Amino acid sequence: MKMSVVIATKDRQHALERTLASLEAQVGAPPFEIVVVDNASVDATRRVVDDYARGALALRYVAEPEPNRGKARNRGVEQARGDFVLFCDDDVRCPPGWIAAHAAAHRGSTDCVVNGPILNVASYESRPKPRLVNYSQAFLCTCNASLSKRAFIAVGGFDERFDLYGWEDTELGVRLRQSSISWKFAWDAYIWHVKPPEENTLAVESRKAIEKARMARRFLAVHPSARARLATGAYGVNLLRARYLLPDSLLALYAGAASSNRAPAWIRALARAQFLDGIYARELVRALDVADAG
């Protein structure tokens, strides 16, 4: 058994360097390689990869000039030499037994998708253990998932029409589920997803919410089911709420509370969640209206 860790990255040289350091410290793993797909970076990503490639890691650099997460990961799998591919993001810290845990979950099984807990942390030094709240029924999450290269290719890989943030891994998960492949959640295959507050600003998350809403429309076009409408929020009551109960004044109130240093932390968190949900819902209505008009 050989594993290929596929990492798509764009302009995250410092985060990528820490991710590679954690992969260099893996123990008990079967033979593995790392394929870093540079998705049109303008920073020193290539230098970081070259530096680590001179060390103990079996590491290869692949360039994908078109900014597109799905396309970058497809390119990485094309270049992968392992029997199994593991996906992780460029801003994670992998515990020393991460690859070994994924490999163990695949041994003795027919083709399956393996997901592990994703623990969002504010700093690279934070290393909590997984709890029940970290369980996820998502069929595939590219921050921490593995499957055979054969199964990935059999369903066609990522749909490269998902060219903005959101839904590309969910869409691939739908096709994998439809292929009748089995699914496992491996508690010991956990990973820390580093999200520093200074990078996780309201402006950044707002942009992601807008992009995710636009990709939700594409997801619904590919999978026009009741389950998909529920998952994306494109159902009657929620769409009515977005049209008539989310005025600019209310979103401005949420944004102000989310940014207030005088408000308690729980108020800021609640206001932030409400603001981002409102941004997503209103953009989803716009995206669906454009699709209907077309």
Residue ranges and their predicted role:
Residues 14-17, 43-51, 97:
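Acidic helix N-cap motif at the loop->helix transition within catalytic regions
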Residues 22, 38-47, 66, 89-95:
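A conserved acidic beta->alpha catalytic loop
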Residues 22-31:
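Short, acidic, metal-binding catalytic loop of nucleotide-sugar glycosyltransferases
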Residues 64-80, 139, 143:
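Glycine-rich, basic loop-to-helix element that forms the pyrophosphate-binding segment
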Residues 85:
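Short aromatic/hydrophobic "clamp" motif used to bind/position activated sugar donors
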Residues 96-128:
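Conserved donor NDP-sugar-binding/catalytic core segment of glycosyltransferases
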Residues 145, 151, 155-156, 162-190:
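A short, conserved alpha-helix in the catalytic core of glycosyltransferases
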Residues 210-211, 228-294:
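Non-catalytic, C-terminal membrane-associated alpha-helical segments of glycosyltransferases
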